Amino acid sequence: MITTVLRRSLLDASKRNLSASLTSINTVLFHNLAPAATRVSDLALIGSSDVKAGFPFGVEAKGIHFQSGPLDFRASMVSQAGFAISESSERRVGDSESVGGDGLAISELGISPEIVKALSSKGIEKLFPIQKAVLEPAMEGRDMIGRARTGTGKTLAFGIPIIDKIIKYNAKHGRGRNPLCLVLAPTRELARQVEKEFRESAPSLDTICLYGGTPIGQQMRQLDYGVDVAVGTPGRVIDLMKRGALNLSEVQFVVLDEADQMLQVGFAEDVEIILEKLPEKRQSMMFSATMPSWIRSLTKKYLNNPLTVDLVGDSDQKLADGITTYSIIADSYGRASIIGPLVTEHAKGGKCIVFTQTKRDADRLSYALARSFKCEALHGDISQSQRERTLAGFRDGHFNILVATDVAARGLDVPNVDLIIHYELPNNTETFVHRTGRTGRAGKKGSAILIYSQDQSRAVKIIEREVGSRFTELPSIAVERGSASMFEGIGSRSGGSFGGGMRDRGSSFGGRSGGGGYGGSSGGYGGGRSGGSSNRYSGDSDRSGFGSFGMRSPEGYGSDRSSQSGGRSSFGGGRSGGSSNNRSSGFGDFGSDRSSQSGGRSSFGGFGSNDGKRSY
């Protein structure tokens, strides 16, 4: 054991010495051999692929640029009318995100030419408002909290300053170190998106994305080789730390992206464990589309006199300015049948994401839509490799409709999404904001349509008020009962899918009848005793249940009393549980003997027998 440790230490030391020697040799070589006309101040090795004319031997000098230039960026370039920045530790810049004219040219910032060139190749020539407001204090090394609406460019806001500093650091100290920057994200999709932004903005940097669902051995080997930027989810980061593969002792920059979601999904303890392992001398930044007050306790503990850059302020509007919101009433049995007309009318051949509450709905709806459209499903039960292929196909335009659960609601930056359809009311306003934020990104236009039932009208008004956006009501689309038969089993015929009254602002958005949904003769997503998406969002129904997956018999997923596997957990509980009630098991029954009654009549076949047996 001791021999192995000593051997690895000697290997790391050899890597560092070799890297430093090569850096020194290259610097001296090019200082002596470069023509006088091209020689300026100290050369910096940054990994650019540019080849400078006049170098001898016809050798392509990878990683050479001649001067990164001073940081020629002044506060006056940001502090414009309506976009002022105060000198206090909390800077409110949220009067208007559109103020600032055409933005600030990236080529005038004095940052590394590599970054300017890389961003220009992506068509990014000017900074968005949050990037303008964040850049100078980030370059100064300030800890900060950045708040902006979804889709306003938060990633580049912290990415540009960090990348520029790492490039300059590498020019002086060489390569072969532990990561200098750590970015934490709540989901693997967001982590991959952030890592992609870093990689494309600075091709010379070594970046890695750390998340579960992929072989950990490959990530360990890449870390052993050496990286500049590590982006990952807290769970995988801690796993690699415990294995000794990830050394955070040299981290100079740490970023928490979508920090509010990080804490809400249960990563609070993991995040604090990671932050405790970081060097005290570092720059810490936190970015999020929303900033609940309770997140302040985290900033007080781990951030040093943080600056707040607030591009939202007290504004009620939580969506980007380019998004138009619509709503439409549809009965549960006909809801799936109107997706096609909505896509045809509002997406106009462009990209569309349809958000469902459950993985089964995503599968079945995508299967049904595939008869008329190019469509794929995306959810947590799909393997990571298939998810990546699906997203790549969607980005590249191989299909134009993506039916997804909330796994795609945060972090996915798919360009030119024209339409978002909420197949059902989301659990809360924040989910609505982040789903809708997949369109109208980076100043583009987009639309979002919310489908709801008649008894959910009050919930729609609450969303309107909390989001700060008035919905335009679309005329109802007539659906013949026969044409909707192919969609039976997706929802039910007995009312709203989110049962329960609006007893508090955080409850589910639904009427008091508790009808509809997935299983149970009177239920939906759970009554007061049955579970649902969580007990907080349960309603008045007593027998519904998207609850625990208890087993009454090997033949079905229904259970009369499956509360032992549910209780207070997110999908648990109640007296009915299961994907159906005690009389409607079978594989994936989405209704009961009194709801969908899809067995034998649905094109999907046999999803609702009356006696706990399969029927095909």
From Swiss-Prot:
A motif (DEAD box) lies at residues 257-260. Residues 135-309 form the Helicase ATP-binding domain. InterPro entries: DEAD/DEAH_box_helicase_dom (IPR011545), DEAD_box_RNA_helicase (IPR050079), Helicase_ATP-bd (IPR014001), Helicase_C-like (IPR001650), P-loop_NTPase (IPR027417), RNA_helicase_DEAD_Q_motif (IPR014014). It catalyses: ATP + H2O = ADP + phosphate + H(+). The Q motif is unique to and characteristic of the DEAD box family of RNA helicases and controls ATP binding and hydrolysis. Keywords: ATP-binding, Helicase, Hydrolase, Mitochondrion, Nucleotide-binding, RNA-binding, Transit peptide. GO terms for biological process: Group II intron splicing; response to cold. ATP binds at A148, R149, T150, G151, T152, G153, K154, T155. GO terms for cellular component: cytosol; mitochondrion; nucleolus; plant-type cell wall; protein-containing complex. Residues 338-482 form the Helicase C-terminal domain. Residues 489-616 are annotated as: Disordered. Residues 532-568, 578-587 have a biased composition (Low complexity). Residues 1-81 form a transit peptide. A motif (Q motif) lies at residues 104-132. Belongs to the DEAD box helicase family. DDX21/DDX50 subfamily. It is an enzyme of class 3 (hydrolase). Its EC number is 3.6.4.13. Residues 492-501, 508-531 have a biased composition (Gly residues). This is DEAD-box ATP-dependent RNA helicase 53, mitochondrial.
